[in-house]
A protein has these predicted regions:
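Hydrophobic packing residues within well-ordered alpha-helices of enzyme cores
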Residues: 12-16, 136, 184
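Active-site glycine-centered loops adjacent to acidic/histidine catalytic or metal-binding residues
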Residues: 59, 86, 177
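Left-handed beta-helix
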Residues: 138-308
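Conserved N-terminal catalytic core of the sugar/cofactor nucleotidyltransferase
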Residues: 1-57, 61, 66-68, 75, ...
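Conserved core of the sugar-phosphate nucleotidyltransferase
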Residues: 62-143
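Alpha-helix/helix-capping structural signal
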Residues: 7, 130-131, 179
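Conserved beta-strand segments of alpha/beta enzyme cores
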Residues: 25-27, 105, 162-164
Length: 308
């Protein structure tokens, strides 16, 4: 199931559809207002039934998949399991405090503490059982008016239930800001051409640390510096310089531009003498005209036409 909020839920449905393209069957559940993660979980009670389940927050990107963690939880009698990751700024996250005498035990969990003595962030992946629904029913809204997942986990522990934790290996990124999305893009692209490369579709080729989609045409009068990904049915015309750290979506046309450390989503057209850096260009956008040689940084929404 995918839980949809009140910000453009139709865009999520438009992208994933019924899930057939991804080999799954998707049920959509609506959370009309942002009342907290625990509130969103409670909306899934009927969908979950008596099964164990995983809650995965959509703005999380992990280097390692969840297979090993899922097997560990499924074969156990745990009431919950959380994943932890060491961070430099714990005040931005829910933070777990482990027992000094027994590091396998969690003492408590606090949401966005101001002065934390722990650097173990609770990442947005929660392994739960239906016991959590009864816990959520007894929660009170936090100071920001939401039913917090950290409060639910703390109450679950307070009632004597068993919560385990595991530490994430590899990187983890919370993509809550444009800067975070750009950084996550760099982390993903760094896997190209390595043993740890993310899976790509069968009709996509990989050359060194550059991935090029099918039916994409690249002019000889252009240059690509990896790591980079170029989608299907793209046209990279003359005078284009791409990379490093560039992701280009399907159906894009680029001409006479330079793009570095940026994400350009599908069906975009850039035919401007512009030097883009650290930018995110949403799908079906168009940039044309002429700019100076200085570096430009843009954050453009869908179907934007920017004339320079």
């Amino acid at each position: 199931a995918i839980i949809l909020g009140d910000i453009y839920p139709e865009k999520v449905r438009e992208y994933y559809g019924n899930g057939e393209e991804f080999g799954v069957n998707i049920t959509y559940i609506y959370q009309e207002k942002p009342k907290g993660i625990s509130h969103a979980i409670r909306l899934c009670k009927e969908f979950v039934g008596n099964d164990k389940f995983i809650v995965y927050l959509g703005d999380n990107v992990l280097r390692k998949n969840l297979t090993d963690y899922t097997k560990k939880f499924s074969s156990s009698d745990l009431d919950a399991m959380i994943l932890l990751c060491e961070v430099d700024n714990p005040s931005k996250f829910g933070v777990a405090y482990v027992d000094k005498d027994d590091s396998s035990k969690i003492k408590n969990i606090i949401e966005k503490p101001k002065n934390s003595t722990s650097n173990l962030a609770v990442i947005g992946v929660y392994f739960l059982t239906p016991k959590i629904f009864g816990i959520i029913d007894n929660l009170k809204p936090s100071s920001r008016g939401e039913l917090e997942i950290t409060d639910a986990l703390q109450l679950l522990m307070d009632k004597g239930n068993t919560i385990a934790h595991d530490t994430v290996t590899g990187w983890w990124k919370d993509t809550g800001t444009p800067e975070d999305i750009i950084h996550a893009n760099r982390l993903v692209l760094d896997s190209i051409g390595t043993e740890d490369q993310f899976l790509v579709e069968k009709d996509i080729s990989t050359k060194d640390n550059i991935i090029i989609g099918s039916n994409t045409k690249i002019s000889q009068d252009s240059s690509i510096i990896g790591p980079a990904i170029i989608g299907k049915n793209c046209k990279i015309e003359s005078g284009v310089r791409l990379g490093p750290y560039v992701s280009i979506g399907d159906g894009c046309t680029l001409e006479n531009c330079s793009v570095e450390n940026s994400i350009i989503m599908e069906n975009c057209k850039i035919d401007a003498q512009v030097n883009l850096v650290s930018s995110i260009i949403a799908r079906s956008s168009h940039i044309d005209g002429n700019a100076n040689s200085k570096k430009s940084q843009f954050l453009l929404g869908e179907r934007t036409h920017l004339k320079l």
